């Protein structure tokens, strides 16, 4: 009987140990100051871009999210890539035929910043059905980093989530669930152009509160618990509680519309029948339970 050598080792990603010094108030204050320096323009569709419209951004953002999910990228890669894309479009007019090339390039650079083993140019070209060549992607990479003045370490909502969770008196198992759902909300917000005007800290805080409310975590009176959390996080990020609450409601509305859209894609006939019932019952007044979402 022949002896076979089998490699049973599983490739694990090397990570640094959690450092509590990185979660202190001094670091958070520095992050809140820095986040505005890498913010895109809110009005670039009207002032800069001639061919690209918000619906095109939505399409390429959804494609980028699917690529990141299929490649099991780190959670920070997609929001960071969208930050690069919005900042570039805030500075440089772009033909719509080159928007997918820009999206692939943004993922390429963000992956280098956040991944141990980054995405390759060849792999990203495959995801475009080889409509772009690796050489084009590398040329676009040089243009991107020059337009962004090599300021690539932008703040994303993910950078703030851990700070918020460390300050909240929740059980560790609850924090893990909140973190998972908040990260999903952050990715969802990055696909929607309405959230460009919100700083990353507010998107992160709104996602955490929306996750808590949807999961019914906290005290037995969940509404009171979320109300207190909203006021607490608004003090942490130094914003008006009403602004944070509005951001949270936007996130819940976006989730609801995304679920409705997904349902229509699965079963259009059933959706039409259910739409009439929903209008009569007025179900839009209650936020969607995030436990119904397959994350």
Swiss-Prot record:
Q: Which GO terms describe its molecular function?
A: cyclin-dependent protein serine/threonine kinase activator activity; cyclin-dependent protein serine/threonine kinase regulator activity; histone deacetylase binding; kinase activity; proline-rich region binding; protein kinase activity; protein kinase binding; protein serine/threonine kinase activator activity
Instruction: Explain what the record says happens when changing residue 269 to R.
Output: Promotes location to the nucleus. Reduces proteasomal degradation, but does not prevent ubiquitination
The annotated region (Disordered) lies at 262-283
UniProt KW Phosphoprotein keyword = yes
Q: Which residues carry this modification: Phosphothreonine?
A: 286
Q: Which SUPFAM superfamilies match?
A: Cyclin-like
Q: What does this protein do?
A: Regulatory component of the cyclin D1-CDK4 (DC) complex that phosphorylates and inhibits members of the retinoblastoma (RB) protein family including RB1 and regulates the cell-cycle during G(1)/S transition. Phosphorylation of RB1 allows dissociation of the transcription factor E2F from the RB/E2F complex and the subsequent transcription of E2F target genes which are responsible for the progression through the G(1) phase. Hypophosphorylates RB1 in early G(1) phase. Cyclin D-CDK4 complexes are major integrators of various mitogenenic and antimitogenic signals.
Query: How the protein assembles, per its UniProt entry?
Result: Interacts with either CDK4 or CDK6 protein kinase to form a serine/threonine kinase holoenzyme complex. The cyclin subunit imparts substrate specificity to the complex. Component of the ternary complex CCND1/CDK4/CDKN1B required for nuclear translocation and modulation of CDK4-mediated kinase activity. Interacts directly with CDKN1B. Can form similar complexes with either CDKN1A or CDKN2A. Interacts with UHRF2; the interaction ubiquitinates CCND1 and appears to occur independently of phosphorylation. Interacts with USP2.
What name does this protein carry?
A: G1/S-specific cyclin-D1
Which organism is this entry from? Answer: Mus musculus
Q: Which gene encodes it?
A: Ccnd1
């Amino acid at each position: 009987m022949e002896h076979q050598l089998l490699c049973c080792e599983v490739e694990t990603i090397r990570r640094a140990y959690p450092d509590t010094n990185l979660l202190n108030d001094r670091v958070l204050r520095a992050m809140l100051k820095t986040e505005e320096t890498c913010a895109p323009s809110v009005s670039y569709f009207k002032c800069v871009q001639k061919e690209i419209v918000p619906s095109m951004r939505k399409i390429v953002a959804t494609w980028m999210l699917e690529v990141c999910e299929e490649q099991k990228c780190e959670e920070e890669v997609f929001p960071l890539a969208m930050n690069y894309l919005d900042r570039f479009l805030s500075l440089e007019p772009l033909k719509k035929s080159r928007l997918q090339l820009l999206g692939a390039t943004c993922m390429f650079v963000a992956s280098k910043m956040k991944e141990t083993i980054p995405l390759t140019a060849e792999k990203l070209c495959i995801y475009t059905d080889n409509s772009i060549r690796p050489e084009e992607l590398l040329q676009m990479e040089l243009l991107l980093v020059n337009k962004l003045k090599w300021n690539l370490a932008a703040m994303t909502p993910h950078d703030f989530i851990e700070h918020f969770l460390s300050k909240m008196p929740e059980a560790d198992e609850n924090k893990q669930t909140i973190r998972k759902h908040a990260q999903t909300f952050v990715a969802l917000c990055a696909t929607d152009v309405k959230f460009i005007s919100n700083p990353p800290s507010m998107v992160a805080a709104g996602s955490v509160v929306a996750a808590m409310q949807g999961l019914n975590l906290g005290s037995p009176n969940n509404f009171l618990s979320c109300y207190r959390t909203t006021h607490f996080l608004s003090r942490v990020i130094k914003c008006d509680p009403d602004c944070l609450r509005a951001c949270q409601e936007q996130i819940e509305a976006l989730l609801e519309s995304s679920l409705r859209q997904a349902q229509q894609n699965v079963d259009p006939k059933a959706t039409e029948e259910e739409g009439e019932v929903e209008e009569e019952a007025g179900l839009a007044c209650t936020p969607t339970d995030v436990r119904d979402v397959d994350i």
